[in-house]
Amino acid sequence: MGEAQLLVEDGNQKLFPCEVCGRCFATDVLERHGPICKKVFNKKRKPFNSLKQRLQGTDIPTVGKSPQPKVQPVRKSNWRQQHEDFINTIRSAKQFTLAIKEGRPLPPPPRPTSNPDYIQCPYCMRRFNETAAQRHINFCKNQTSRPVFDPIQMAARLVSRAQCKAQASLKK
């Protein structure tokens, strides 16, 4: 305690600062405070859980959620296929512009490439990623199950309705 510097003299008591926290105490109090202060400052404090504090005293049960690591599937890189598609598209565009300049017939368009990760809709044969395919297939199923109105039949019905209305007006 001799090496601690006298900080404040409060009335007739001399106060000395704590080496750990810097607060001032009398010598007899500082002897008791020192070991406790060192122990407190060396401990790691748990982060305060405000949810637990708020739910305390209520009937709402606290359910401990275990953090689940998000496992994302590792997708294989298909950059080479994309690169080849890009090169073929550029080449076909050059052939197209050259055919227009020279007046030749236009070359056939390049074949569309299909992504193997996409899912094909069984109703319209279009391809979608997984999440879009789930939504689309339900939609497309509902659309294909709806009755299709033939324009010829609709015209015939309209004519027959008009005739019925004409006959009904004549009877009145």
Swiss-Prot record:
Residues binding Zn(2+) 2, per UniProt: 121, 124, 136, 140
PROSITE patterns in the cross-refs: ZF_C2HC_C3H
Cofactor(s) listed in the protein's UniProt record: Zn(2+)
ZnF bounds (C2HC/C3H-type): 14-43, 117-146
Keywords: Metal-binding, Repeat, Zinc, Zinc-finger
GO MF terms, alphabetically ordered: zinc ion binding
Domain of life where this protein originates: Eukaryota
Residues reported in the UniProt entry to bind Zn(2+) 1: 18, 21, 33, 37
Similarity comment text for this entry: Belongs to the ZC2HC1 family.
Protein name: Zinc finger C2HC domain-containing protein 1B
Recorded name of the encoding gene: Zc2hc1b
